[in-house]
């Protein structure tokens, strides 16, 4: 049930991390026989109760559980999708095993948010549309902001044909609207379809992400 428990927590309770930690610490000294939530399974044994307590304590700290990369992209004609797939390919070549790739136009944001919470790194890719960030990516970032998402590492790739706005918009969001977010690598702005001369830029970004993954330490919250 862990995946669905995380999806419920991050999308419904995620905004209220400090309150969750306070509540857990207040009851941590009590002898709890069972937890019967409105959603999900009933936790009946000391082992499962301790397990879900520690999960909620960790999730409410807004820190990742595992090293890995979530690639979230929006694409109008398939060009940004191709770039996202190339990023995944280059990361795989460098030995990164935990890679999740999502089309923000097709996947419910709750699933992407759950994995963004779980993994240390995220890559966001989107095109410019009407001199703004592509709406489905704008919505995804808005959802993350509303849930107080923080303490993660993100890389950014914009895509445009005539005028560029997506890359700058995503950089502004993650540097101004979120707490403790680290931009990994140089934000990229690819013009139209992915071309041969763009590959070194993608490869360099993959190098930077892999180096950041290797340097990242996972901290586990304690009661």
What are these regions (language model features)?
Residues 1-42, 86-102, 112-223:
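FMN-binding flavodoxin-like domain, especially the glycine-rich phosphate-binding loop
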Residues 34-68:
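Terminal amphipathic helices with adjacent charged low-complexity linkers/tails
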Residues 47-48, 82, 167:
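A short acidic (Asp/Glu
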Residues 53, 101-107:
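Short gly/ser/thr-rich secondary-structure transition/capping motifs
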Residues 68-72, 155:
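Conserved beta-strand elements of the Class I
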Residues 72-93:
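Short, charged N-terminal beta->alpha structural module
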Residues 73-76, 104, 158-159:
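Cofactor-binding loop segments of dinucleotide-utilizing enzymes, especially the Rossmann-like FAD-
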Residues 78, 108, 163:
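Flexible, glycine-rich phosphate/dinucleotide-binding loops
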